[in-house]
Regions:
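Loop/turn-to-beta-strand initiation segments
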Residues: 88, 165, 248-251, 274-277
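Short glycine-centered helix-capping/turn motifs at secondary-structure transition points
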Residues: 46-48, 123, 207, 249, ...
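Walker A/P-loop
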Residues: 168-212, 269, 274
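Peripheral, non-AAA+ core regions of ATP-driven protein-machinery
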Residues: 1-168, 172-179, 280-281
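Conserved Walker
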Residues: 168-172, 237-244, 257, 274-283
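P-loop NTPase nucleotide-binding/switch module
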Residues: 125-159, 163, 191-244
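Conserved AAA+/SF3 P-loop NTPase catalytic/coupling segment centered on the Walker-B
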Residues: 240-273
Length: 283
């Protein structure tokens, strides 16, 4: 992809073998977010861009075959980590808005393509710092006022919302258990700025942030009762956050609880007791 993107951008590589070293060698390296740093490193190495223009920057991004820079997951936590080290960030234009939330003083470059970045560092087309964006929910939450009767159950829901308690509803089909649970987010307090950042960082790692805009609504997750342990607590071949993490600062609704696998339910014990999810994987 790096070679094809450079060729499409009119930035041909020299006619000789080029070796790219990713250090430290003992750490596993996978994913498309290495495309952009490799390409920019090559451009600096052969003199296509000033060799010092990358100093003090963390770089993430995927390359298209036409030289465009595509979005990658995890840009927001990468930006926060880079800012903590005093670095700037070079990332895809589609991710610039979420990266801008890391710090108002942080230097962020979000080019659309390799050519646009080359024009920026040579002074031909200076890039503006991306502005942070907020995505307001397009639909209204189900309202607790819609529920008629069930005063005791509604009171329990209010107590759980006020104190951040877990809640178990038991009753016959049609009693309104699911309807009440789906209305819990409507009585929860708004996300604080710190909570909003936490929720958005998890969404960024999971690749569910839309247009780089932060989420301003508490998450509501309702996995099917056939969900696996990896889907619930996270993991998989390429480890990703599970439903427990995706519902952080929000609601994890397990409808038809007895239908869930006993192993899946038992996997929730540690997160409930410690307040964190730890995934151990070989290699």
């Amino acid at each position: 992809r790096v070679r094809a993107a450079r060729f499409a951008s009119g930035l041909a590589l020299p006619a000789r073998r080029i070796t790219v070293n990713l250090a430290p060698a003992d750490l596993p390296k996978e994913g498309s977010h290495y495309d952009l740093p490799i390409a920019l490193g090559l451009m600096a190495g052969i003199g296509a861009i000033p060799s010092d223009c990358l100093a003090g920057f963390t770089v993430v991004g995927e390359l298209g075959l036409d030289g465009s820079i595509a979005a990658v997951a995890g840009v927001l936590p990468a930006a926060i980590g880079a800012n903590a080290r005093g670095h700037g960030l070079i990332c895809p234009a589609a991710c610039g808005a979420e990266a801008a939330w890391a710090s108002p003083e942080m230097e962020i470059l979000a080019p659309l393509s390799l050519i646009q970045f080359a024009n920026h560092v040579t002074g031909k087309q200076v890039l503006d710092r991306p502005d942070p964006r907020m995505r307001s929910a397009s639909t209204a939450l189900p309202d607790l006022r819609d529920v008629k009767g069930q005063e005791t159950a509604k009171r329990a829901l209010e107590v759980a919302a006020a104190g951040g308690h877990n809640l178990l509803y038991v009753g016959p089909p049609g009693a309104g258990k699911s309807m009440l649970a789906q209305r819990l987010p409507s009585i929860l307090p708004p996300l604080t700025p710190a909570e909003m950042l936490d929720v958005s960082m998890i969404a960024s790692v999971a690749g569910t942030i839309e247009d780089g805009a932060l989420v301003d609504r508490r998450p509501f997750r309702a996995p099917h009762h056939s969900a696996s342990m990896a889907a619930m607590v996270g993991g998989g071949m390429k480890a990703k956050p599970g439903e427990v993490s995706l519902s952080h600062h929000g609601v994890l609704f397990l409808d038809e609880l007895p239908e869930f696998s006993p192993q899946v339910l038992d996997s929730l014990r540690q997160p409930l007791e410690t307040g964190e999810v730890l995934i151990a994987r070989a290699n």
